[in-house]
Amino acid sequence: MSKWKTIVVGIDGSPPSRTALTWAATEAADHGADLVVLTVWERTLLPPMGSGGVPRSPLPDPSQRATEDLLTVIKAELGEDPPVPVHPLVKQGNAAQVLIKQSADADLLVVGTRGRGGFRGLVLGSVSQHVAAYAKCPVTVVR
């Protein structure tokens, strides 16, 4: 049995992050660890604009939307009754920085190869590269 007690997986809803989620859940089940499923939203500087340059209203609460999206992905990938304790976590900020900070409380950090942004030709996205270089715990990049 492993010493892992907490596995953190970063997801953004992209196919690679969904694969990372299912991989991390399997590892957590195999090692008797809790699974923290983390998503990060970044504040946009400008609200969505309607016609005439007038902001659309009402503006959705990005934290609430991120939470709803996170719970939807967890349910879609792990089902109604996941095989491990799952702790959804929503944070605001830069994804790489938030994941690195969260890695201080983890025994393993799991990310997908690429997220929603970036260039299609890259094997690793900028977030996964940055996290792999600076995390405070071991990192697994799932393909």
Regions found by a protein language model. Give the residues of each.
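A short acidic, glycine-rich active-site loop
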Residues: P55-D69
